[in-house]
C-alpha cells in the first residue's frame, strides 16, 4: 500500500517501514529480543556489503565496530550527516543498531604498550609509539567515542525524545597488571591495588564524558582486561566507585573455559549488564598437551584444551543464559560475536542467528497455575 502511495523504490519503502518496526525496549514487558551481529570480525567487508549479507542471514541489526569502514568515531563525533548516512545503509537492508564497539582503542588505555598494539590501533592513536603517549591518546579517543555514539543514536530513525535502549559503547580497558596474573614472582595485594588504581585514574575522565553524553560503557570481561572473571569485575566496579556509566558487555565464551560460572556472572551484576554477546566456546578438548593458558598455540590447533565455536556448537548453556537474562530484566539485543576457526563464517553466522532466534523467548506474564484460581476463570 505504501508503494502504491508513491514511494519510488524499495529503499524508500524500507526507510519508511523501519521506524514502525521498533519497539520500546524499556517497556516492563520483555519481548523476544533483536538478534544483531557484531561487525568486528567482518571489517574486511564494507558496511554496505556486510549489511546486505547480514540481512540475508536473518539478522535484525548490527553492532558496529569502530574499525574498518563500519563506524568512524572522528566523523560521527562532529557530523550529523555522517551518522544519518550510517543509518541509511542499515535501513536500506531493514537493519537497526543499539551499540557501537571500541575494543581495540580501549585495549590501549591501560595496557603495557608494545609493538603488537601498532597493528590494532589507528595511526593517530599509535603516533610515534611512546607507551604513555599512546595510552593518553587512546583515552582521549575513547572519550570521544561517547560523543560519537550519542550523535549516532540521536540520528536513529523513529527515535522519540528518549532512547529506546540505553546508548552503549562496548569495549576493552586493557590492564597494567595482567602480566602478573600467575602471582609469580610473589605478588601481594598492594601490587594489584595499584593496577586497579591506575585503571580508575585513567577511566575517571572517560566515564565523566560518558556521563555527559548519557552513554554507558560496557566492558567485555575478558582475559587481558582489568576484569576477567566475577571477582575482578567486582573489584573494577569498586575501583570506579560504582560509576553508573560503567557496566559490562556480557560474553560467556570468555568465562566458561576459565571455570567461571558464566550464569552466576549475570546474577552477580543484574543492574550492570548493559549489553550481551552470544558467543560460544568449548573446553575439555585437545590431546592433553595444552591447558587453559593455550600453550602458545594458535586457534584451531587440535591440541588445544579450548577454542571458540559457532554459537550452539560449543559447551555454553545458552538456555540458562536466556533464563538469567530474563530474570534480571535485560531487554536489549542478543548480539552474536561469531568466531570459529574451523567453519566458514557465512555458514556459521547464519546458523548462529537461527540458533539464537529459536532459543530466545518472551518471559511469562502470569503464573502458570493462576488459571486454577476461580477468580481467573
Language model regions located:
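Active-site acidic/histidine proton-transfer and metal-coordination neighborhood
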Residues: 23-24, 49, 53, 92, ...
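Hydrophobic faces of well-ordered beta-strands that scaffold small-molecule active sites
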Residues: 33-39, 62-64, 97-102, 169-171, ...
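Active-site beta-loop-alpha junctions enriched in small/polar residues
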Residues: 38-42, 65-69, 102-105, 174-176, ...
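Short, acidic/polar
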Residues: 43-54, 137-148, 258-266, 318-320
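Catalytic domains of carbohydrate-active enzymes, especially glycoside hydrolases
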Residues: 50-68
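Conserved, mostly hydrophobic/aromatic
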Residues: 54, 62, 90, 100, ...
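Acidic/histidine-rich catalytic cores of soluble enzymes
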Residues: 61, 100, 182-315, 364-376
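Glycine-rich, proline-tolerant flexible connector loops at the mouths of alpha/beta enzymes
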Residues: 65-87
Amino acid at each position: 500500500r505504501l508503494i502504491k502511495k508513491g514511494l519510488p523504490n524499495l529503499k524508500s519503502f524500507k526507510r519508511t517501514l523501519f521506524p514502525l518496526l521498533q519497539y520500546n525496549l524499556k517497556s516492563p514487558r520483555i519481548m523476544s529480543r533483536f538478534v544483531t551481529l557484531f561487525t568486528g570480525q567482518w571489517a574486511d567487508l564494507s558496511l554496505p556489503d556486510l549489511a546486505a549479507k547480514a540481512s540475508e542471514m536473518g539478522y535484525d541489526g548490527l553492532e558496529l565496530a569502530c574499525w574498518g569502514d563500519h563506524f568512524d568515531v572522528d566523523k560521527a563525533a562532529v557530523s550529523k550527516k555522517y551518522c544519518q548516512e550510517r543509518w541509511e545503509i542499515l535501513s536500506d537492508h531493514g537493519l537497526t543498531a543499539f551499540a557501537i564497539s571500541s575494543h581495540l582503542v580501549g585495549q590501549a588505555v591501560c595496557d603495557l604498550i608494545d609493538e603488537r598494539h601498532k597493528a590494532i590501533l589507528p595511526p593517530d592513536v599509535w603516533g610515534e609509539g611512546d607507551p604513555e603517549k599512546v595510552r593518553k591518546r587512546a583515552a582521549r579517543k575513547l572519550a570521544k567515542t561517547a560523543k560519537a555514539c550519542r550523535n549516532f543514536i540521536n540520528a536513529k530513525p523513529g527515535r522519540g525524545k528518549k532512547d529506546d535502549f540505553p546508548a552503549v559503547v562496548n569495549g576493552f580497558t586493557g590492564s597494567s597488571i595482567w602480566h602478573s596474573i600467575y602471582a609469580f614472582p610473589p605478588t601481594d595485594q598492594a601490587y594489584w591495588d595499584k593496577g586497579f588504581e591506575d585503571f580508575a585514574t585513567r577511566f575517571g575522565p572517560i566515564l565523566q564524558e560518558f556521563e555527559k553524553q548519557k552513554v554507558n560503557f560496557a566492558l567485555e570481561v575478558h582475559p587481558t582486561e582489568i576484569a576477567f572473571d566475577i571477582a575482578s569485575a567486582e573489584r573494577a566496579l569498586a575501583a570506579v566507585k560504582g560509576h553508573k556509566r560503567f557496566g559490562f558487555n556480557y560474553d560467556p565464551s570468555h568465562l566458561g573455559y576459565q571455570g567461571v560460572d558464566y550464569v552466576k556472572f549475570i546474577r552477580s551484576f543484574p543492574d550492570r549488564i548493559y549489553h550481551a554477546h552470544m558467543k560460544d566456546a568449548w573446553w575439555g578438548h585437545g590431546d592433553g598437551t595444552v591447558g587453559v593458558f593455550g600453550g602458545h598455540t594458535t586457534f584451531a590447533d587440535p591440541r588445544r584444551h579450548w577454542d571458540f565455536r559457532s554459537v550452539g556448537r560449543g559447551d555454553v548453556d545458552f538456555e540458562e543464559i536466556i533464563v538469567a537474562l530474563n530474570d534480571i530484566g535485560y531487554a536489549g539485543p542478543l548480539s552474536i560475536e561469531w568466531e570459529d576457526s574451523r567453519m566458514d563464517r557465512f555458514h556459521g553466522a547464519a546458523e548462529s542467528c537461527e540458533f539464537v532466534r529459536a532459543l530466545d523467548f518472551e518471559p511469562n506474564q502470569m503464573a502458570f497455575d493462576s488459571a486454577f484460581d476461580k477468580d481467573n476463570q
